[in-house]
């Protein structure tokens, strides 16, 4: 998901 312009992958 994208949070604060940061892409995180589970």
From Swiss-Prot:
General function of this protein: Strongly inhibits trypsin and plasma enzyme(s) activity.
Stated name of the protein: Serine proteinase inhibitor
Coiled coil: none
GO MF terms, alphabetically ordered: serine-type endopeptidase inhibitor activity
Record family assignment: Belongs to the serpin family.
Keyword terms, alphabetized: Protease inhibitor, Serine protease inhibitor
Assembly: Monomer.
